[in-house]
Amino acid sequence: MRLSNKESKMLADKTVILGVTGSIAAYKAADVASKLTQAGARVEVVMTESATRFITPLTLSSITGRPVVSSMWELTSEFNIEHVALAEAADVVAITPATANIMAHLVTGIADDMLTCTVLATKAPIVLAPAMDENMFKNPVTQENLAKLKARGFVIVGPSYGRLASGKMGQGRLAEASQILDTIKQVLGRSGDLAGRLVVVTAGGTREPIDPVRYIGNRSSGKMGYALASAARDRGAEVKLITAVTSVTLLEPSGVGIIRVETALQMKKAVAKVVKGADALIMAAAVADYQPQSASKVKIKKESPRLTIELARTPDVLAEVKGNFVKVGFAAESEDIMANAQKKLKEKRLDLIVANDITDKNSSF
């Protein structure tokens, strides 16, 4: 089974109001606009006057193929009241970057430009991606405003820790475009066909300690589990992702509950706890079949030319888990792929199994 690099089709034909405010991070809105447009969304950019000092409307218009609105006094060919027309057309509003000033305006209901008027007039969900100096972000007034906006249903993404415009390191850096896009997809998926369902997904590969330094592990990337968690979330499900170690760095899916484990036993306990009340368990993790019979508490010295380690079976998480839910398993095989997958399907009494040919260079293992 192969993973596609294409964005989820859920953004196709959706109208996204992309609000851009006066921050040095405003130039990054171009990347967000590009990703949304490539995913099939109709992107309507609304800029504050100060935002136009950091990035030109022409840049964003060229990316989206749509005119950019930045003034309360611009007439449209349809002669609509612009902020009302935009507000009614929106499936989601995303303000990136969101300054401390715009958040203060939204809290108090001040509507003195096209962007704030549009936000007040819309019934669409609103995503805010704050960006500012760390001291401004941590100011009690800003934190109070953020808390009020969250309480009103605004979805906040970031800010992250990193190098700021001042040259200092701190929290206040605009979230990455991929993270903002992921959050928008999460918000749009709330009313999907899996709304009200709980889906538990496992990912990554477990590690069984030999001593404090060494372990038995595998090459699982975790990509499949993370992609499945994102897909279930995009369709409205509540998702719990139990992740072991991944061989590559992966972006945590926005809006997904993350539980980190390392060993097969930890995986078993986490699954047993989280799966209560679940509608589906998708076991995409590569759980070790064997573990050292007894792990050394101190580092094993290389005093002998040979080292023999006695191994014991680990618990079979998928076979032993109990509950009335759909069970999906994975069979990572290098030979007799279909036969081995069918055997596992029957022996573990699964509802569905995915056969994964790990010899394929495009394998999603």
Regions found by a protein language model. Give the residues of each.
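A cross-family phosphate/adenosyl-ligand binding-site feature
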Residues: R2-L128, D133-F365
